[in-house]
A protein has these predicted regions:
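Positively charged n-region of N-terminal signal peptides that target proteins for export
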Residues: 1-4
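Sec/Tat signal peptide C-region and signal peptidase I cleavage site
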Residues: 16-20
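N-terminal catalytic scaffold of extracellular/periplasmic and nuclease hydrolases
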Residues: 21-123
Length: 123
């Protein structure tokens, strides 16, 4: 009986020492904010190419995911659902289909997103 208690005690000590070993994990956090419906690199209001868009961010995120793999965290900080006709179409015209924004965020594998003040304007 003493031997069993001793073995379990040694196993417990071994398990605790292994758990206490320090492990460094390198994370990459990519955050978007104030996208304002700029899902494509084109401004549908001015009819010109647009420098910022989720499409361009996706290209950047793909490269970063190659290096960081599952250690990349992709977040959005809100104000993404208004600003361009592509967003307004799903906000007011086609309210039954999945919203283009949610489709793009799912495709890009966002880990989380929160609402900004402009995101509640559509109701």
């Amino acid at each position: 009986m003493k031997r069993i208690v001793l073995i379990y005690g040694l196993l417990l000590c071994l398990a605790l020492s292994v758990a206490a070993q320090e492990k460094v994990v390198k994370l990459k956090i990519v955050e978007t904010s104030d996208v304002h419906g700029n899902y494509y690199p084109y401004n549908f209001i001015t009819r010109h190419e647009w420098k910022g868009s989720l499409a361009r961010i996706y290209s950047f995120v793909q490269k970063e995911r190659e290096q960081y793999k599952e250690n990349l965290i992709l977040l959005d900080n809100g104000d993404i659902l208004q600003g361009q006709p592509t967003a307004y179409y799903y906000n007011y015209i086609d309210t039954v289909s999945p919203h283009l924004c949610s489709e793009m965020m799912n495709y890009m594998k966002y880990d989380a997103g929160n609402m900004g003040n402009h995101d509640v304007e559509t109701g």
